[in-house]
Amino acid sequence: MARMVHCVKLNKEAEGLDFPPLPGELGKKIWQSVSKEAWAGWLKHQTMLINENRLNMADTRARQYLLKQTEKYFFGEGADQASGYVPPPSA
């Protein structure tokens, strides 16, 4: 049976992640309170941030920026938006 969590991002009960996605306390916190669906949304958003901001993941500053954005996305005021991104019109 799947592990269920109350997802802080979606504000509903949903299937939890199989393992902490990051090392350390942030990874544990995400594992305990973020659903697979919300994590998939973060991965898409993270990809946009990397591409639009031309982040070099070999650069420590870029990795630190993404860690801060991860925490803001789930537990703060929301992550930065990609500078060139325009959301699709809602139907």
From Swiss-Prot:
GO biological process terms held by the UniProt record: cellular response to oxidative stress
The keyword Iron is annotated on this UniProt entry: yes
GO molecular function, one term: iron ion binding
Record key words, sorted: Iron
Superkingdom of the source species: Bacteria
A Gene Ontology cellular-component term: cytosol
Pfam families assigned to the protein according to its UniProt record, in alphabetical order: Iron_traffic (PF04362)
Claim: NADP is one of the keywords in the record: no
InterPro entries from the UniProt entry: Fe_traffick_prot_YggX, Fe_traffick_prot_YggX_sf
Family: Belongs to the Fe(2+)-trafficking protein family.
The protein's role, per its UniProt record: Could be a mediator in iron transactions between iron acquisition and iron-requiring processes, such as synthesis and/or repair of Fe-S clusters in biosynthetic enzymes.
PANTHER family: FE(2+)-TRAFFICKING PROTEIN-RELATED (PTHR36965:SF1)
The protein's name in its UniProt record: Probable Fe(2+)-trafficking protein
Lineage: Bacteria, Pseudomonadati, Pseudomonadota, Betaproteobacteria, Burkholderiales
